[in-house]
Amino acid sequence: MQKSKSIFIPKAFAPQQQAQAPPSKLDNKDPSVEGEGASKPKDDEYLSENVLSHINSTIEKLVKPYEIFPSEDIRPDLFALVTALEAKMEDCIRRNGDTITGPLRLLTQPAANFDVTNKEYVDWIYSIVNTRLDSKWDRNADIDMNHFKIKNIQTPQELHDAATKAYVDEKVELINNLHTIPTHHLWSKATLVGKKTWFFHPGFICPQTLHLSAIGFSTSPNKYKIGEKTKFGELNPTRLYVVVNQEIRSEHVVEKDVQIGYILKRFETPIVLEEGCNFRLMTESCLPDASVNVSFY
């Protein structure tokens, strides 16, 4: 398409005999066509032919007066021109489906089903839907569907809680590990240090990464009544502590009347002992004839 060669001349510099209203800034008249009988192209035809040429032509109309009269205070209505240009482009794109590359910003909200959406519209829809979901139920709240209560969706705890795929996969993997990987055992007698009883003292150093799966605890039968006073100010042990690198990793209650071979704890999720860790067990009071057995893989 030919570039526009028309020049906008302010009234002050126009010849008196040719004085007339200045042409509209959005005039799409082709300057190469002269005469009153010349046909004026329609806006949609003009735009659909080449949107970029129309933009360049419109910008040229803004720049030309500054080039010819640089000292004049010429202030075209930029906002009205840009808004009208955008409306024409939007209408052309909507009807003709022209492809435009680069950033496309629309001032108006999408209305028809085939209108392009903008970031503001998408964010608004997301906010509305998210607010409605949050107001209806919390993501990890209890849900009552058809009188079946589903609780603790993300982290099932009770027997009637719903189990997620991740929870089931974790348990299946644990079963596979227990049955496919050989389990080993370590046994230790008590070592008294002060008023505490230590096992694996001064410490078992893990030669590689180990997974502690169970702990056995025993004393002489009927000799100790766990939790009952033996002396003034002293109690028999009520808890067994798992100590890794001088830090208590877990603790487990010791039942009363513990007999030989009693399994104190079988871990659903094994305690991981990294290579080089110092591992010990400890009770709160003295049990000189107690012993422990741990299973690991």
Swiss-Prot record:
Low complexity bias: where? 10-23
From start to end residue, where is composition biased (Basic and acidic residues)?
26-44
| Region (Disordered), start-end ranges | 1-44
Q: What is this protein called?
A: Uncharacterized protein 125R
- The species this protein was found in: Invertebrate iridescent virus 3 (IIV-3)
